[in-house]
């Protein structure tokens, strides 16, 4: 059986600048993986390339052994870094739209998460705070039964008091046979849920492996090791 996700010698250039530089990695099934790096390290470029939103300069991405396309979009549930929803829509209208568009979307799960996060489905997006809009986007992503969930900075715009609740929402609502790839620079908040980590620096993978094994080998937390690797 093919790996769920495989990147082979992936390079992406914008002009003469390397956003990704010969990235090779594989993700199996049933793992929670942290894609970790400072701003500008190439995390979002890698995620967009995996989703087929950017074309690599060299190398390739394989999803279940196939290039990104219509079939890969059926099994990937993607949370982009920026809000993409129309402000004039009501939350319930967006849920109905996703339910019509995705066969694997659970309306019941979406409304359950709205209730737990105290979001009124009758509200229009333009009346919601930035953090609440991001919660709505997260709910939409986690209401699908996907094979691969890709979350780009899911807690970046959420206040610290809500972060644990957001992480609990992620953990209790994703398909446990699926893989969860989470991009973030907020290591302290998220390392407790990670099975594996990938450190991305200047578009290159500089560290990858089991989070537990790396903690044992380095004798410190992932956050402390991250600070050491990326020390200015």
Predicted regions and their residues:
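Conserved ABC transporter NBD signature motif
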Residues: 59-72
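The feature captures the beta-strand-to-loop junction immediately N-terminal to the Walker
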Residues: 33-38
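ABC ATPase "signature
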Residues: 208-209
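Catalytic Walker B motif of ABC-type/P-loop ATPase nucleotide-binding domains
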Residues: 149-153, 158
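ABC-family P-loop ATPase nucleotide-binding domains
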Residues: 81-136
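Helix-to-loop junction immediately C-terminal to a conserved catalytic motif
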Residues: 51
């Amino acid at each position: 059986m093919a790996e769920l996700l495989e990147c082979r010698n992936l390079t992406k250039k914008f002009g003469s600048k390397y956003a990704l530089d010969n990235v090779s990695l594989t993700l199996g099934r049933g793992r929670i993986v942290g894609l970790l790096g400072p701003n500008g390290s190439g995390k979002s470029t890698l995620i967009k390339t995996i989703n087929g939103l950017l074309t690599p300069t060299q190398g390739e991405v394989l999803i279940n052994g196939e290039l990104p396309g219509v079939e890969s979009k059926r099994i990937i549930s993607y949370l982009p870094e920026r809000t993409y929803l129309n402000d004039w829509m009501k939350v319930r209208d967006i849920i109905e739209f996703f339910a019509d568009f995705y066969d694997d979307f659970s309306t019941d799960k979406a409304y359950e998460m709205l209730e737990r996060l105290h979001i009124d489905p009758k509200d229009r997006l333009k009346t919601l705070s930035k953090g609440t809009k991001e919660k709505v986007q997260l709910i939409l992503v986690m209401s699908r039964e996907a094979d691969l969930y890709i979350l780009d900075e899911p807690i970046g715009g959420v206040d610290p008091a809500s972060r644990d609740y957001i992480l609990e929402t992620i953990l209790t609502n994703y398909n446990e046979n699926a893989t969860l790839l989470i991009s973030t620079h907020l290591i302290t908040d998220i390392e407790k849920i990670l099975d594996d980590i990938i450190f991305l620096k200047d578009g290159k993978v500089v560290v990858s492996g089991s989070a537990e094994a790396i903690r044992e080998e380095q004798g410190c937390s992932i956050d402390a090791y991250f600070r050491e690797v990326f020390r200015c």
